[in-house]
């Protein structure tokens, strides 16, 4: 590990994505230390400010199909070299929720998901034992998309699967976290950072290159 046990990763995607639930804003980033999510970060694919191709009455009042969202089906890449130690499949991609009404109903079932095991929380996911130390989780992958097997070695940029909306997810996105052991129910979360990416200024202008950092909440980033 590097200074402060910080795992340095590459962004696990191509194109522009918005950082959400960032540890640059607060720790624990997801409001809890449970399931080793202490320093986890979420990324949502965007084009400009839009995360979906369509916005209509369902966006405001109901649920939406995940295929509407730009992230759905996008390749998710290995952010570090290492060995795949866990693959979980078999979770369905459920409907997405941007509506406040749908989000309230979904929040009421949170406790049930927390007791439902790794699949109910992380959905379809891959865990990589990173060569530099730590275990990297890529969560909420698309049903049937995972392309790696347990025991397989992967290089940086190796395609693991596709972004989906499985598990505890309100819209298609990829969740990334690093742990000190492969079991999220007993592991501790470890700090992470990303190398070699660009940040697109919210007011426009030329993207700013970052050699090593943690994307701020709401920052739109893309790999160099």
Segments the model singles out, each with a brief description of its role:
Residues 155-168:
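Short hydrophobic beta/alpha edge segments that flank linear recognition/processing sites
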Residues 83-141:
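Zn2+-dependent peptidoglycan hydrolase active-site motif and core
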Residues 74-84:
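Generic structural motif
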Residues 70-72, 121-122, 146-147:
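Short, small/polar residue-rich loop motifs at catalytic or cofactor-binding pockets
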Residues 1-69:
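Non-catalytic extracellular/periplasmic "stalk"
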